[in-house]
Amino acid sequence: VKYRIPILILALLLMIPSAVGMAKTRINYDMLDYLPEDMDTVIGQNDLMEDFGKGAFSFIVVDGMSDRDVDSLCERIKQVEHVETVLWYSSLADITIPKELLPDSIYNEFNNGDSTLVAVFLDSATSADVTMDAIRQIRSVCGSQCFVSGMSALVTDLKDLCEEEEPVYVGIAVLLACAAMVIFLDNWLIPFVFLASIGMMILLNMGTNYFFGEISYITKALSAVLQLAVTMDYSIFLWHSYNEQRQLHSDPKDAMAAAIRATLTSVIGSSVTTVAGFIALCFMSFTLGKDLGIVMAKGVLLGVIGCVTCLLYTSDAADDK
């Protein structure tokens, strides 16, 4: 208890490298990276890259554009970095030859009314960062008359959607947790102390993921909300213990020390059970479980440290009731 000021200063200083580490941690959007190496899908993807130099692919639906303009568009797409092949009618025959001369079975595969289909193959993996950059460049080249589809385009949209919505649902979770604690706790300031402490531990957890090199987008999307939900109970538990000890000790610092001693074993026991559940995910052959399990187990441990630390400052908040 007597070292609470140095502990607070240390925690605040750790937020700086944590923020840097969080920004530098790569987010992996490729689910193939988490599949076992002996799966046919992974073997096929590796063979496609090694033997044919093709990994990602995309289909572009071109609507209401003349054949000459489509041919010009294909040439511009070929200039995009990491585009390996662009397949369209002009890849098989000169565009001066009417497409209607093709057999119906072939013509109908690539044309429907005023729309035509262009296939694009890239020399990079389906969800690589350079692939997503290439998809964005292709979309900027194509304009509003074209619709880019395929797995790589889906992953690109998924990344943009996750980055856009994550702050929204994390903010909603914080507001709901804050509202619940304000209603059910006997001190209006305590919820903000708890949320600040847990927020710091979430940032520390996300920042230390830098040492893993990368985490999956699913882990990134879920870990903050899960850590908030799982570790908030520990703070509330300790707060109620502090209130009980406050009736027995006139000095708030003595009450804090007694509350920590009285509840620390229970909190650690509960957290170990939670950590064990997340560690169990590490034994999945689908290694996304390992990715999520390690991050969340680390988050729970940091959450326990944070909630015990945050109790050191509740006496000041209690005096402001």
Model-derived features with residue positions:
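A general secondary-structure junction signal
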Residues: 62-64, 90-92, 150-152
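Solvent-exposed, non-transmembrane loop/terminal regulatory segments of multi-pass membrane proteins
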Residues: 23-61, 96-111, 126-130
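Membrane-embedded transmembrane helical bundles of large multi-pass transporters/channels
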Residues: 1-27, 126-316, 321
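Active-site-flanking beta-strand signature of metal-NTP-handling nucleotidyl enzymes
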Residues: 57-63, 116-120
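Extracytoplasmic
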Residues: 38, 42, 68-121, 156-160
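Short glycine/proline-enriched coil/turn segments at helix->beta-strand junctions
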Residues: 53-55, 66, 82, 140-146
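Solvent-exposed, non-transmembrane alpha-helical starts
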Residues: 31, 35, 59, 67-72, ...
